[in-house]
Design a protein with these regions (language model features):
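Peripheral (often C-terminal) accessory segments that flank ATP-dependent C-N-forming ligase machineries
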Residues: 94, 111, 289-389
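A conserved helix-loop-beta module that forms one wall/lid of the active-site cleft
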Residues: 67-134, 141, 153-160
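Short beta-strand-to-turn element immediately C-terminal to the catalytic PLP-Schiff-base lysine
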Residues: 105, 135-140, 187-189, 254
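Beta-strand scaffold of nucleotide-dependent catalytic cores
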Residues: 136, 146-150, 172-174, 181-202, ...
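Active-site "cap" helix and flanking loop/linker of ATP-utilizing ligase/carboxylase catalytic domains
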Residues: 227-249, 255, 264-321
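Conserved ATP-binding module of the ATP-grasp superfamily
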Residues: 98-101, 121-124, 141-178, 209, ...
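Short, well-ordered beta-strand elements within core beta-sheets of diverse protein domains
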Residues: 136, 175, 217-218, 277, ...
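ATP-binding N-terminal substructure of ATP-dependent carboxylate-amine bond-forming enzymes
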Residues: 1-78, 109, 341-356, 364-389
Length: 389
């Protein structure tokens, strides 16, 4: 559609690599230098202009490849800041943004030895995981001990250790921030944030786990507050050194001000981006590509309608047998799509240890209440058939 050649760099074999072998390179992300010459040759042939990480696992690699190939990108240091919640908190505090109290503890610490350093309620979280994995609110020292042990166990699991490197040795403890939660989707160009959407999260996220479910845009917050949120986001991006590419920023709002929860140098996760439709029949992914190529996206606007997405939660552990009620949910007025992301036979693991959703429900309506209601009603028709482990 936009007349470009794409090279897919993946750590998993892709079905279409059989049909487009010149456009797919499969590699071990940890040993990327072994494949750099193949990428360089492709670049010489097709004039590689940008390297884009599409998820949490690939954004560091994108920065490394860009640096090696002398392609404009966020610095490796700045991307690493977004991937380490402790370092991010430290930088945001230095910038003068509102910050909760926070402290990092080794998983080898004994809770009784750090009791005097704690204030309740507080939140425990790994420094590197996403999708609310391992994030727990605790209201007492008894809860803290249980939560600390749970996270210590999670951080010693092999697949988690492989992702986290040295960060698996640490648990971040920070003040629980009450208030309404929102997220901002945007693209940064030369350090300036172009906001694409502000998502409201109409269901309260108060713990003990933080299961995100419904996102709705456009926001119904007043314009002054929305402007304030964008100012906070811009300050955070400057503090972290993010100057280019897609960003996904999460914030809490209360009577004390705006607090950054997350600032990721990537677009929104999962299939959530499907809910965003821009004038000119453009998707979020197309906008990201256009911006990466230096094309002007400043006048881009969302199509004027109220839309929402529900990340269908995993509520119990087991082996998935079947998801029932999909046809009934899709038949509801206002539901525009439903896509599952876990197949029968796969293991279901709920938060706080899990990191996946059953799938995604999409809806549109005349206002936020109608979108929220139809998503909740459609979800009520879904029945998960599973086998206990």
């Amino acid at each position: 559609k936009i007349g470009i050649n794409i090279l897919v760099i993946t750590n998993n074999s892709q079905v279409f690599s059989e049909y487009y072998p010149e456009n797919v390179i499969t590699m071990n992300f940890e040993h990327w230098r072994e494949s750099i010459e193949n990428i360089r040759k492709w670049s010489e042939r097709y004039d590689l202009k940008a390297v884009i990480g599409v998820d949490e696992e690939s954004i560091i690699l994108a920065a490394k490849l860009s640096e090696s190939l002398c392609i404009e990108h966020n610095s490796l240091e700045s991307v690493k800041l977004t991937k380490n919640k402790y370092l991010m908190r430290r930088e945001l505090k230095k910038s003068g943004l509102k910050s909760p109290w926070f402290k990092r503890f080794s998983i080898d610490e004994k809770p009784k030895d750090i009791f005097t350093e704690l204030r309740f309620p507080c939140v425990l979280k790994p420094t590197f995981l996403s999708a609310s994995q391992g994030v727990l609110r605790v209201n007492s020292f008894k809860d803290f001990v249980k939560g600390f042990e749970l996270l210590s166990d999670l951080l010693t699991e092999m697949k988690v250790k492989k992702r986290g490197g040295d960060q698996v040795k640490w648990i971040l403890v920070e003040e629980y921030i009450p208030g309404k939660e929102v997220s901002i989707e945007g693209i940064v160009n030369e350090g300036k944030l172009k906001d694409l959407a502000i998502f409201d999260k109409p269901e309260p996220l108060e713990g003990p786990i933080f299961q995100e479910t419904i996102l709705i845009t456009p926001s119904i917050l007043d314009e002054h507050l929305q402007f304030s949120l964008l100012e906070t986001a811009q300050t955070a991006l400057k503090a972290l050194g993010i100057r280019k590419g897609p960003v996904h920023i999460e914030l809490r709002i209360n009577d004390k001000g705006n607090y950054i929860l997350e600032c990721a140098a990537r677009s929104i996760g999962g299939l959530c981006s499907k809910v965003l439709e821009f004038k000119g029949a453009m998707s979020l992914e197309e906008l990201i590509l256009r911006s990466a190529l230096g094309r002007n996206i400043e006048k881009t606007q969302l199509i004027d309608k109220v839309v929402g997405v529900m990340m269908m939660p995993i509520e119990k552990s087991g082996i998935l047998k079947e998801i029932q009620g999909i046809k009934e949910a899709l038949a509801m007025k206002g539901i525009t799509d439903l896509q599952t992301t876990i197949k029968p036979g796969e293991i279901l693991e709920p938060l706080p240890k899990g990191d996946r959703y059953l799938g995604f429900l999409f809806a549109e309506g005349k206002n936020q209440d109608s979108v929220k209601t139809v998503l909740q009603e459609a979800w009520s028709k879904i029945v998960i058939v599973f086998e206990e482990i």
